[in-house]
Amino acid sequence: MSEPQKAAAPTSALDRYFKISERGSSIAAEFRGGLAAFFAMSYIVVLNPLVIGTGADASERTLGIAPVAAVTALVAGVMTILMGVIAKQPFAMAAGLGVNALLASTIATTPNLTWADIMGLVVLAGLIMTVLVLTGFRTAVFEAVPESLKTAIVVGIGFFISFIGLVDSGIIRRMPDAAGTTVPVSLGAGGHLLGWPTLVFLFGLFFTIALFIRNVKGAILWGVLASTALSLILEAVVPSGSVKESATGWSLNVPSLADMKFTTPNFSLIGSADLFGAFSHIGPLAASLLVFTILLSVFFDAMGVSVGLAAEAGTMKDGKVEDIDKVLLVDAFGSVIGGGASGSANQIFVESATGIGAGARTGFANIVTGVLFLLAIFISPLVTIVPFEAVAPALVVVGFLMIRQAVNIDWTDWGLGIPAFLTIIFMPLSYSIANGIGAGFVAYTFIRLVQGRGKEVHWLMYLVSAVFVIYFGMGIINGWTS
């Protein structure tokens, strides 16, 4: 966990408002952090349209690549700035990959459901979360979690973002089903590290580690910039192309210094969500179950990510995230606004840890990140120049920084150690923060009951554990109701 430096006296109104000096930071550090966070997150403007922009709904309508890209950048920019201004935390926001994958798969498998319908359900989930925050329920759940489980969430997120970095950079690859093997992943292509993009990742990883060891300020950002420069040179001299063309290609976008060009954004999706359409098209029960699924995923993702990021940024006091009620309120707005713009629920992005690793400690870094997202609406190369292989090393290094907190977990108490272990291991292996939290919560309440120490468990933990049991059993429930 990062320790804030000794606070200096505020030098301006901006400094006082964002608590820059109070948190031991500086304008320069916040700029570095904001830039690093944007570079780590900008891929979402490319990826989100591919996830939800191409699939046809029941009316044979697609959202479209260009409109989704426009609203993805717009809502990410607006919500990130709002989080910085209102909550004053360096927690950037964008369309959540878990939720958008859920929406895409639901559209593909549910007859009579349209994109307008399902985006309306996202808005409803956001409105329910807003009510839960305003009534204090969401914050109460947050505070009912034992400290060891909160620490386990931080460690689990550390493993998760490191795993994301390794997988999305191609160092660890998913094994194709046709391979006929029970091994789900392998090292590189066919068990070997191949290709220039892999070299960029390895260079970035060891260069960033070296900068950290030498205590260079902005090590994360310098690592991303140096890796990006190397990727541009390599692609110009020895083109690798996309991974779609070759197993040794770039994983998401091919780095290139294309001419800066201004594009006219397409905002036609804004306001197209149908709040109650799903209830008439697929029935009240099925629609309610979908709202519940979306709500639970977003609800606990935010809780876990905010704990992890605040612990790394040093913005926790007495085991609580500073201004957590404001953090959760803005996060709830992210689903309302994201769904209303048909860009999917916007959530606190775990890649914000990259910005924190580069020096971000306050909401001012969010202003930098948010403005860059808004510029990306009009200037296309902003989100295509940096390949994921240049950003992935930062995720791995920041993951290591978060994993170090495992020493603060009481592993000698089975009632804390086993739930902590399940929380940690479920996050990367199920590719879901919410799943890890749920596994830990259910195990915690169960083991405490077996130990005869059930009275030590907060009643909200019993309630939330019961909800997670229902959530994990949704497949069975859907089978009964279909």
Where are these predicted regions, by residue range?
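Juxtamembrane transmembrane-helix boundary signature
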Residues: 2, 75-97, 128
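Helix-loop-helix hairpins and the membrane-proximal interhelical loops
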Residues: 2-66, 185-189, 224, 228-325, ...
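Helix-loop-helix junctions within the multi-pass membrane cores of secondary transporters/permeases
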Residues: 10-48, 75-76, 96-105, 109-154, ...
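Hydrophobic, aromatic-rich alpha-helical transmembrane segments
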Residues: 22-34, 61-69, 73, 114-118, ...
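Hydrophobic/aromatic residues within the transmembrane alpha-helices of Major Facilitator Superfamily
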Residues: 35-42, 78, 85, 162, ...
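A generic, lipid-embedded transmembrane alpha helix
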Residues: 72-84, 104, 158-162
